[in-house]
Each structure stands twice: as C-alpha cells, then as structure tokens.
Amino acid sequence: TVAACNSPKVGLDSDAELVR
C-alpha cells in the first residue's frame, strides 16, 4: 500500500488493504 500513499485515488484501497 506504499503506492496508495502516493496515489490519493488508491487511498481508499489502501485503507481496505490495512484492514485485511
């Protein structure tokens, strides 16, 4: 989810990955 930090569009996805 490191890329999610750089991409705001993937911000929501990063959250879901953290929950997993």
Swiss-Prot record:
Give any GO molecular function from the UniProt entry: serine-type endopeptidase inhibitor activity
Question: Which source organism?
Answer: Spinacia oleracea
As for family, the record states: Belongs to the leguminous Kunitz-type inhibitor family.
Keyword Metal-binding applies = no
- Protein name, per record: Kunitz-type serine protease inhibitor SOTI
Q: Does the keyword RNA-binding apply?
A: no
**How does temperature influence activity?**
Thermostable when incubated at pH 8.0 at temperatures between 40 and 100 degrees Celsius.
Entry keyword set: Protease inhibitor, Serine protease inhibitor
Please explain the role this protein plays, according to its UniProt record: Inhibitor of bovine trypsin with a Ki of 2.3 uM. Inhibits 50% of the proteolytic activity of P.rapae larvae midgut extract at a concentration of 20 ug/ml. Inhibitory activity against trypsin is reduced by 43% in the presence of the lysine modifier TBNS, but is not affected by dithiothreitol.
Reported pH dependence: Stable at pH values ranging from 3.0-11.0 at 4 degrees Celsius.
Miscellaneous notes: On the 2D-gel the determined pI of this protein is: 4.05, its MW is: 23 kDa.
